[in-house]
Swiss-Prot record:
This is Small ribosomal subunit protein uS13. The gene is rpsM. It comes from Herminiimonas arsenicoxydans. PROSITE patterns: RIBOSOMAL_S13_1, RIBOSOMAL_S13_2. Coiled coil: none annotated. The lineage of its organism: Bacteria, Pseudomonadati, Pseudomonadota, Betaproteobacteria, Burkholderiales. GO terms for cellular component: cytosol; small ribosomal subunit.
Length: 121
């Protein structure tokens, strides 16, 4: 397995698909990286030679990926929560931040349903 940006990229996949195993690289960015380095997108990762892998590593190093990207996203969310703005409050409460309805739905964000408490006398 080729190791790029601290991630083992699957050998059996095409280069453009294999690069998506790296957090922060999707299909469009993987396509642009392959075009910029001159690596064929249909070439399997196991067939890449060392010079092509080095070109890919250099090109990917220009982007924020993996741990740095995760850290940046979590710091942005933490900043919103510290500001106390609407989006920060929604993050703090574990509710959707982008205007979705919550009376029904929003189960992914809210978690499993809590059973209704019966009234005791």
């Amino acid at each position: 397995m080729a190791r790029i940006a601290g991630v083992n990229v699957p050998n059996h996949q095409h280069t453009v698909i294999g690069l998506t195993a790296i957090y922060g690289i999707g299909r469009p960015r993987a396509q642009k990286i392959c075009d910029a380095t001159g690596v064929l997108t249909t070439k399997k990762v196991k067939d890449l030679d060392d010079s092509e892998l080095e070109k890919l590593r250099d090109e990917i190093a220009k982007f924020i990926v993996e741990g740095d990207l995760r850290r940046e996203i979590s710091m942005n969310i933490k900043r919103l929560m510290d500001l106390g703005c609407y989006r920060g409050m929604r993050h703090r409460k574990g509710l959707p931040c982008r205007g979705q309805r919550t009376r029904t739905n929003a189960r992914t964000r809210k978690g499993p349903r809590k059973a209704a408490q019966s009234l005791k006398k």
